[in-house]
């Protein structure tokens, strides 16, 4: 076993709007662990592609990768304390960037390219990894794997509320409904790393639960492991 693999990982997977990011932040604060928001990595890459008006082709994307140091850029984002410029955060939070990120996630060599970037966040004392394939592909040896689900309309409403609170000017219910539906279909049906629970994942339905309730449920499972004492 390598030194890196001695670092414990807890994964939280699920579709958008189920509360992964918020729960991830609560759990990481309780455990004082590092955080990986894998969706942000795809969104940052999607924003760079959008900003540079790069067409979707292997040649164009490869040229872009050679001209940017994505690894260094990603490492400068402190997920644990959510340190990221407000302008960049607002840009990558837009739903159209999320959809572009979802399209990128369907490209095999993009996923392979970003696999190392994601695994590089595995550092002591531990890592809370949030995404769509954290427990199935990126960290299959995670000590605990959670998969959050929620009613679709509840997820859309949560996303609208999130945008309103953050002052993001793309809070159109019908558009968000359509975009999330499209993204769900793409995430579930892609051939590479589809959005599915790991075989040993713990499924949590957050439809009628508050952030505090969901966080407490996850923490109760975590605390059952003797090594964790808060």
Curated annotation (Swiss-Prot):
Q: What is its EC number?
A: 2.7.4.25
Q: Which reaction does it catalyse?
A: CMP + ATP = CDP + ADP; dCMP + ATP = dCDP + ADP
**Gene Ontology MF term list:** ATP binding; CMP kinase activity; dCMP kinase activity
Positions binding ATP in this chain are 14-22
Stored Gene3D superfamilies: P-loop containing nucleotide triphosphate hydrolases
Q: Which GO terms describe its cellular component?
A: cytoplasm
Q: Which GO terms describe its biological process?
A: pyrimidine nucleotide metabolic process
By its UniProt entry, which InterPro entries does this protein fall under? Cytidylate_kin (IPR003136), Cytidylate_kinase_dom (IPR011994), P-loop_NTPase (IPR027417)
Which keywords does UniProt give here?
ATP-binding, Cytoplasm, Kinase, Nucleotide-binding, Transferase
Q: Name one Pfam family in it.
A: Cytidylate_kin
Q: Which CDD domains match?
A: CMPK
Give the enzyme class. Answer: transferase
The highest taxon in the source lineage is: Bacteria
Enumerate the subcellular locations listed in this protein's record, separating them with semicolons: Cytoplasm
In which family does this protein belong, per the annotation?
A: Belongs to the cytidylate kinase family. Type 1 subfamily.
Q: Which NCBIfam families match?
A: cmk
- State the protein's name: Cytidylate kinase
Q: Which organism is it from?
A: Buchnera aphidicola subsp. Baizongia pistaciae (strain Bp)
